[in-house]
Amino acid sequence: MDKDKGSIIHEPLVPRTFRLLAELEKEGDGIVSYGLENPEDNTFTNWNGSILANNGILYELKIVCDNNYPKVPPKVKFVTKINLPCVNQSNGEILPNSLNVLKNWNRDCTIESYLQAIKSEMDSNLTKLKQPPEGSKF
């Protein structure tokens, strides 16, 4: 709220496509990475992701940014089998509200911040929980 005028200042919303294009150009940090499943997809809906865990295993993920992104988080699903409290063990999907980034999702959150939160969960739990054989898929 502008203290001098008593009015609310609204920042313009960046269109979904521009936002996702900016995220695509960033692509992650090598430990956490992501990109379009199909480089010709001008809807920016279907993405691939990967997370290099501390155990040296590269975990693959599928990411879907529907038309409500970034207002709502993308759907994220592990392709590589993993045992984590935040993952549905029957299909690999990240459970709703299982991570702080999901509980506190807002337009400033990104695909990268979501994947970083998953990486943090992996760092905390991979060695504590029995994991499926390397290379197994959901």
PLM-predicted stretches and their roles:
Residues 1-138:
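UBC/E2-like fold recognition across ubiquitin and ubiquitin-like conjugation systems
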